Regions:
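Basic-flanked hydrophobic alpha-helices used for secretion and membrane insertion
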Residues: 2-167
């Protein structure tokens, strides 16, 4: 897993824009057999949160449903579904059940630049997916409909590569 971070970028126009070409070149030069390869973006639900830089108060990021399901498939998990006006959450494995319950109770709606989403009935996922999908100092990522993601500000790029054989 490789990801860019927006946290040290202070202007939207300076956000990293990478296609991870150097990774592709390394894979090709070393004849590494690839089983799965996925590049995707994560978004701020509200662009106004871009300048929120208080340690331990960074906003959670959002991932488009199609990308989240592609990650799940890559890792052998079943896909999830959402209605067009719903969101779900994916939690870091270290997050405590009590903390998740408290957060969910206070966050039944998600305000985005594309409108308000309501919490899905099946809203909490916690399978291991790696560290790079979470924003700094957060244990949760929002899963949102693809149509909503298309309207939001992409701030982080991720590339997940699974090799055919252990390196």
């Amino acid at each position: 897993q490789i990801s860019s971070r927006y946290n040290d970028v202070y202007e939207v126009e300076n956000l990293p824009d990478t296609d991870y070409g150097e990774i592709t070149a390394f894979i090709e030069q070393n004849n590494i057999a690839i089983k799965d390869d996925l590049t995707f973006s994560e978004y701020l639900p509200q662009k106004s949160d871009f300048h929120q830089r208080v340690k331990y108060d960074f906003p959670p990021l959002a991932i488009a449903l199609k990308d989240y399901n592609a990650v799940r498939k890559m890792l052998g998990y079943e896909p999830i579904t959402l209605q067009t006006d719903e969101f779900a959450t994916h939690w870091h494995r270290a997050a405590e059940d009590k903390d998740i319950e408290n957060y969910i109770a206070k966050h039944t709606l998600l305000e985005t630049d594309a409108g308000t989403l309501k919490l899905s009935e099946n809203a909490v996922f916690q399978e291991p997916v790696g560290e790079s999908i979470y924003n700094l100092y957060t244990d949760v990522v929002y899963i949102i409909p693809d149509e909503i993601a298309q309207v939001l500000l992409p701030v982080q790029s991720n590339r997940f590569v699974m090799t055919q054989y252990p390196l």
